[in-house]
């Protein structure tokens, strides 16, 4: 009798927490190596749409390659997080992946305002960011996150931009998952 699952994928936690499903309109800001985006994009299927945006060209190329390797139909673009080239109320889910804490305060505000604008009423914004270290971990590996962000954090930023039902969903494997919902009109 097997007590534990041994076939857990590298992004199963992220996929489960996002709740992304077939037919969703997905936006990911900050694609990094593109592997998380490729996995999330595979979940929306042909009836949904996945768009990944990164402000670094190299990250866009890595994300395109990861999506192609995974065999998913997805769109990847190079752009400014504070000026998204998308229609209002288009996305069901926005994932902000490991970028918001490294932005300057004015960029962070503009990014969250744009995220709010492009989300459908009732749409969800999920911020995935490094969990803050404490104890010896904080001494030996200090955070590169903006100190002004550390005092308020993602929860306060989401609330300030009008998101509701803001909550910290989990802290696991060095990552924190914070969710906010755009209220229905």
Model regions: which residues?
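Class I SAM-dependent methyltransferase SAM/SAH-binding core
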Residues: 25-27, 32-83
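A short glycine-rich, Lys/Arg-flanked "PGG" loop and its adjoining helix->strand segment in the class I
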Residues: 109-121
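A short SAM/SAH-binding and catalytic strip from SAM-dependent methyltransferases
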Residues: 93-107
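Conserved alpha-helix/loop element of class I SAM-dependent methyltransferases that forms part
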Residues: 5-24, 39
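C-terminal alpha-helical "lid/dimerization" subdomain adjacent to the S-adenosyl-L-methionine
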Residues: 4, 123-179
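A short acidic, Gly/Pro-enriched loop at the edge of an enzyme's catalytic core
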Residues: 82-94
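Helix-to-beta-strand junctions that scaffold the AdoMet/dcAdoMet cofactor pocket
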Residues: 45, 103-105, 119-121
């Amino acid at each position: 009798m097997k007590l534990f699952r041994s076939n857990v994928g590298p992004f199963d936690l992220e996929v489960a927490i996002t709740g992304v499903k077939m037919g969703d309109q997905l936006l990911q800001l900050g694609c990094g190596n593109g592997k998380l985006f490729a996995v999330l994009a595979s979940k929306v299927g042909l009836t949904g749409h996945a768009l990944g945006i990164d402000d670094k060209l190299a990250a866009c190329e890595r994300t395109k390659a990861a999506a192609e390797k995974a065999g998913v139909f997805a769109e990847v673009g190079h752009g400014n997080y504070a000026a998204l080239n998308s229609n209002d109320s288009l996305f069901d889910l926005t994932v902000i992946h490991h970028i918001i804490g490294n932005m300057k305060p004015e960029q962070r505000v503009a990014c969250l305002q744009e995220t709010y604008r492009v989300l459908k009423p009732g749409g969800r914004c999920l911020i995935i960011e490094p969990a803050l270290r404490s104890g010896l971990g904080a001494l030996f590996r200090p955070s590169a996150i903006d100190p002004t962000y550390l005092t308020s954090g993602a929860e306060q930023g989401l609330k300030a931009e009008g998101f509701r039902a803001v909550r910290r969903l989990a802290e696991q494997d060095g990552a924190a998952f914070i969710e906010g919902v755009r209220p229905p009109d």
